[in-house]
Design a protein with these regions (language model features):
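Hydrophobic alpha-helical signal peptides and transmembrane signal-/tail-anchor segments
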Residues: 15-25
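Conserved beta-strand-loop surface patch within small alpha/beta domains used
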Residues: 44-123, 132-184
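Short hydrophobic alpha-helical segments enriched in small aliphatic residues
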Residues: 5-7, 22, 29, 37
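Short, Lys/Arg-enriched N-terminal segments with co-localized hydrophobic residues
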Residues: 34-46
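N-terminal polybasic/positive-inside topogenic patches
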Residues: 7-12, 34
């Protein structure tokens, strides 16, 4: 068993809120900590996103080739409980041709969805690059996150020799959860 305990204090009223969560050790690995404006903490489960090394390498190359602009695409695959397995990556055109935001070509999006359906795959989410900023959703990314079940993958090229690739979920209230990313 693993035990998580933490407290927060509001200076105005010295209110101490203590939460103790007891989970099996296999569940603890997938927990993330978030904070609301009210200073109340809570735990949320993250998903496991599984991707083949060859797909990861293809995304790195595609995004590097797109620098200094953001690159983007869609991912499709299978969902099995809390595991989303990426089976196909769709590389799409960034119509904005810009280094701080992207707009996917709608014709390419439609073709990708049509292809995924024909292969019996589920659309899992999207990926894009951050040429100069960290691998985390920007305020614009959160604002544009329309599907709380989608995976939002971001590759940062703050250091071109060491790109950082992370996967996130964004809920309806725009809270972000980092998912576990497995490259296999």
């Amino acid at each position: 068993m693993c035990r998580h305990a933490f407290a927060t204090c509001r200076s105005q009223d010295y209110l101490i809120i203590l939460f103790i969560y007891v989970f099996s050790s296999s569940v603890c690995a997938g927990l993330t900590l978030d904070k609301y404006e009210s200073d109340i903490f809570y735990w949320r489960m993250s998903m496991v996103i599984r991707m083949k090394k060859s797909d990861y390498d293809s995304i790195v190359r595609y995004c590097l080739d797109g620098l200094p602009n953001e690159s983007c695409g869609l991912i499709a695959g299978f969902v099995d409980g809390d595991v989303k397995s990426v089976e196909k990556v769709y590389f799409l055109t960034n119509l904005d041709n810009n280094n701080v935001h992207f707009t996917m070509d709608p014709k390419e999006q439609f073709a990708a969805v049509k292809d995924a359906r024909s292969l019996g795959l589920t659309m899992l989410g999207n990926f894009h690059s951050h040429p100069e900023t960290p691998s985390r959703p920007s305020e614009e990314d959160k604002r544009l996150a329309y599907d709380s079940t989608a995976v939002y993958m971001i590759m940062s090229f703050m250091d071109n020799d060491n790109p950082v690739f992370k996967a996130f979920g964004v809920d309806k209230d725009k809270n972000v959860t980092e998912h576990v990313l497995e490259i296999v």
